[in-house]
A protein has these predicted regions:
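Thiamine diphosphate
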Residues: 1-164, 169, ...
Length: 313
């Protein structure tokens, strides 16, 4: 068996920016002294005159990005999720969100898989913070192919976009000729009739593996990748819930305010359904190797399999 190709979506971000930069002179990239980590250094090397290092001043970076947007530029402001969504939240809300400016926020190192950097750098709340800002699009791609497509879609969309990327290399699962990325549209990766599992980001590949284990036990799981958490694919959520009668959500984020909450918001109004949310259960993270943390917090394939099996019984 050939080895599965793995790429960190932060790498995809840097590479996609270069691809877009070659086509669009109005694209600028801002960073806050973390270009080597966010991988905007790839763009910086290719287009040094269009890369702005704002230093360790994330709030200022967002303000600069907002100003550039008013001048017709398309700025991608980049930092770790903890700083882009956390430290700079007020500026994102009031300077970008309120006037609905065409600013893109590239947030890397999101979730528990930041690993050894520990709880202070593991942003488990960013989706919740960003999806509540009126007019903000929130995207959490699952692999290299989807991340590149998401960056392109963000550029083409007129308005603020929050892009969530990871530090850890993840399997490429969308490497097929018919793959198509559409903002606000979920992707059915596996058909099933017993339970619908909605997942996003890093957890997509783990959920697919869990579904195979469930199938061996006679549980037919439908797996749906929700790359765009806002606007969310309400029609697909309702249809899958009605088809299976049981719903599970899986995310590398707090169970409060993230994908699980977004799915429940839809179902509460349109198709009340029993839901099991799998994610970080209202706790902070900790320092440790990323793969060990993913397992400890129950986001690996084996843990997902066990939780879904217990829920469906």
């Amino acid at each position: 068996m050939s080895e599965v190709k793995k790429i960190a979506t932060r790498e995809s971000y840097g590479n996609a920016l270069v691809e877009l930069g070659k086509e669009h002179d109005n694209l600028l990239v801002l960073d806050a002294d973390l270009a080597a980590a966010t991988k905007t250094s790839i763009f910086q090397k290719e287009f040094p005159e269009r890369h702005i290092d704002c230093g360790i001043a994330e709030a200022n970076m967002i303000g600069i990005a907002a100003g550039l947007a008013t001048c017709g530029k398309v700025p991608f402001a980049s930092s770790f999720a903890m700083f882009a969504a956390g430290r700079a939240y007020e500026q994102v809300r009031n300077t970008v969100g309120y006037p609905h400016l065409n600013v893109k926020i590239g947030a890397t190192h999101a979730g528990i898989s930041v690993g050894e950097d520990g709880a202070t750098h593991q942003c488990l709340e960013d989706i919740a913070l960003m999806r509540e800002i009126p007019g903000m699009v929130v995207i959490n791609p699952s692999d290299d192919v989807e991340a590149r497509a998401a960056v392109k879609a963000a550029y083409e969309y007129e308005g603020p976009v929050y892009l969530r990327f990871g530090r850890l290399a993840v399997p490429v699962i969308n490497d097929n000729a018919d793959y198509k990325f559409e903002l606000g549209k979920g992707v059915v990766l596996r058909e099933g009739k017993d339970v619908a599992i909605f997942t996003t980001g890093l957890c997509v590949s783990e959920t697919l593996q869990a579904a195979e284990k469930l199938a061996a036990d006679g549980i037919d799981a439908k797996v749906i990748n929700i790359h765009t958490i806002k606007p969310i694919d309400e029609d697909l959520i309702v249809a899958a819930a009605k088809e299976t009668g049981k719903v599970v959500t899986v995310e590398e984020h707090s169970v409060i305010g993230g994908l699980g909450s977004a799915v429940c918001d839809v179902l509460a109004e349109k198709a009340p359904t029993l839901v099991k949310k799998i994610g970080i259960n209202d706790v902070f993270g900790e320092s440790g190797p990323a793969l060990e943390l993913i397992k400890k917090y129950g986001l690996d394939a084996e843990s997902i399999y066990k939780k879904v099996k217990e829920f469906v019984k």
